[in-house]
Amino acid sequence: MHHDLLIVASEVLFSPFMDGILKDWTPSRPHGSSAGLSLSGGIDSTACMAIMPDDTVLLHHRRSFKSLLKHDGADSLFKHIERTTGRTVHSIPSDHENIRVHWGKSVGFSTDMAAAVHLILLADHFDLRGIAIGMPLDNTYLWHGFRYRDFSTTVWWQRWGSLFKSIGLDIILPIAGVSEATAVRIVQDAGLGHVVSSCLRAKHPGCGRCWKCFHKNGMLGHPYNINSREIQTFLSKRPVRTATHALWWVNEQNHWDQVPDLSHMSELDFSWWTKHHPPAFDLLPDWIRPVIQSAIETATEPIPVDSPFHTWNLFPDAD
């Protein structure tokens, strides 16, 4: 394993708690030849798999410690993938989500890119030149899901993009220019809508009570209880969590009675939500861009230049 991979793995896991990890370090790892995908088994990463080359290496992060989160849904999808395509999903056990606990925080990823640390550490083994993650437009060109921004100029992209590129690993964001709604459509078009689930609480089709069952699995026709505690809690927050997608779904299902103070938003033009943002293609490395761009352009139309998306701000008073 190249030393650079250990350095960057340490950065994604420990940088929120330790300074100077990259000090006096000069990267030197050459790029490999293959693309790798952090495949959680949820809708967003499955959509990435559907539009990436068939030889993309599929790697899953599996919690190796006792947890409320379940891998049953993901395992069902992985078995289906292997049975129908012959492709292998490499499930890598790890307890790195416990690192945060030592600094008084809850279990979880130390940074966004910690979700791909298994790909970093196995980059030489699989000869990787790029790492893909399922980050939709909701998290890229929309700040906290409700306010437009130019993602290419963000600190996130400039920090992680340049760091990974320096060790021969391009960050690949296949669905950066499409919403969660379009990700669902891509999964359905790939014939995987009946086996995929973003719920981590129960087996397929999900628990029906969590936020993911509401705004993700619900689009696949899976049942959800709008009155469940978690769904009601998130609907009552301002700004609403994953606001644009959640309110688009509220509009689609006519759930405005659940958010009466936001009922005026039913007059907004959400039509762009199922289209794609062409500038996101510029984030893709040249060596993989044609395949992904072609798939997205086939699946959906571009967002018009006069769309309200370009000035979108659902909660202008929010910090």
Regions found by a protein language model. Give the residues of each.
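Nucleotide-activated chemistry modules centered on ATP-dependent adenylation/adenylyltransferase
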Residues: 4, 9, 17-35, 43, ...
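Metallo-beta-lactamase
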Residues: 40
